[in-house]
Amino acid sequence: MDTLILNGYDLTLQDVYDVAYDGRKVEIAADAYARLAKGREIMQELSKGGKAIYGFNRGVGQNKDVTIDEDFMETQNRMMLRSHSLGLPPFNTDEEVRAMMVIRLNNMLIGASCASDDLANSYRDFLNHGITPRIPRRGAVGEADITTITHIGLAFIGEEDVNYKGEVVSAKEAMEKEGLKPLHLQLKDTHTIMLSNSQGEGTAAILVHEVENLVKMSDRIFCLDYEGLNGNIEPMREDVNELRGLPGQIRCAARCREDLEGSYLYSDNRPEHALQDPLTFRGGFIITGAVEDALDYVKKFLSIQINSPSDNPCIMLDKKDVFVNSNFETTSLVIGVEMLAIALAHLSRAVNYRLIRMCMPEFTHLPRFLAPRNGSAHGYDEVQNVLSCLDAENRYLTTPSSVDFYPMQGSIEDHASNLPLAVTKCRQMVDNLRYLVGMEALFASQAVDLRKSDDNGDYVHLGKGTQKAYDVLRAVVPEMKSNRSVYDDINKAYQLVLEEKFLADGE
């Protein structure tokens, strides 16, 4: 994989994933170093001219009225870094932290932050040498993640532990092994480290990636469920969905048609089917389409934020001046994340309803609870309790957190977004949905097997994509022909979803 050249302006979400998951190397564009130097020059000239500059020659928060002498700046940097590193466990994953770091490195290169070259190089070197700071997940309110991402700075100066080659070691030890030196903090470096929403943005980027793949797998398993039901395929027609015009719906319907290519559902000699199926079947792909529409909203604002500065004050290179601002606000993005959570709750409820219905013989014309025909097993009867539990938790997790905040710092900081918390809740929903989608794969495959076992079951042949999903599951979970631990089946199916085994080749 080629080296990613960062310049502050054109980082993509795919670039973030490449760095976070695959360890893609990064380098800093030459013109970015020039912008960093110009920003420092402007800041120092204005300060020498007597201009009060927040976070540079003045304190931060309620201490904005405290003057900081130039001789005290290095000490102030260390004091502020230590005093603000207050995050609480559990810790973010390595992938999340790497996403945070590449995002913060990128948007500081615009030149609005007064970052030193050494600070930018520290981000680059930690990424390229596989040294990952341990960032606590809790403690930030999303109005710049000042109490959590400051732990990155402590790692840079060698004062905290890091994840390195599968072990937790001191940052100093990891740097020594990689031939790196601790960062010497200069000018406004600590303020640059802390005045960023990179925890919320980095975790949101990972969330987007996970949801994109979950939706694809959910659509494929939904189609397999549709085959288990012997459902009416008409709602998936291209012309019908184009008539409505919703982008997510159109994409998901097209994906379902592709997965069902060659399916018996398109055959003229299949058994009689219902004229109209329940909405969670008839419009299942429309519900995942709504998830994709919410994703589009999140990606729009996230892509803007990872390529723009959140620094306060910000240096305007063309104006040769510094301006206070509130560009670290993440309200638009957090509203998108909470909208995504609501969309995922709709998906959760739809899966739940589908699986409860699949246990009803009057609906499926298959044995009750999809039990083997010999009547010797309970099938999936008690799984409904697990489904309902997970769905109830998902409903609870949709409760907005972005409007829960308190005035702080003498009421100067009287607004917040709780973006990191909103993302954390949404990612828990994703993990719950992995179980739900895995259980839908179990139900769907069992329904297909039961339909094949009918006296006239030769008509059952699966689609191009659904056959792959069926084969992936049956490679680890055999057909239920008698009582066995469904607990094991559920966890095996979950693992397949977690490892994204149900995705098509190349996705």
Language-model-detected regions and their locations in the chain:
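C-terminal auxiliary extensions adjacent to catalytic cores
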Residues: 2-24, 29-31, 35, 39-42, ...
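Glycine-rich, flexible loop motifs
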Residues: 1-14, 19-50, 75, 80-136, ...
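Acidic, glycine-rich active-site loops and adjacent beta-strand->loop/helix elements
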Residues: 60, 87, 106-107, 127, ...
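Short, charged/polar low-complexity linear motifs in solvent-exposed/disordered segments
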Residues: 73, 80-81, 416, 456
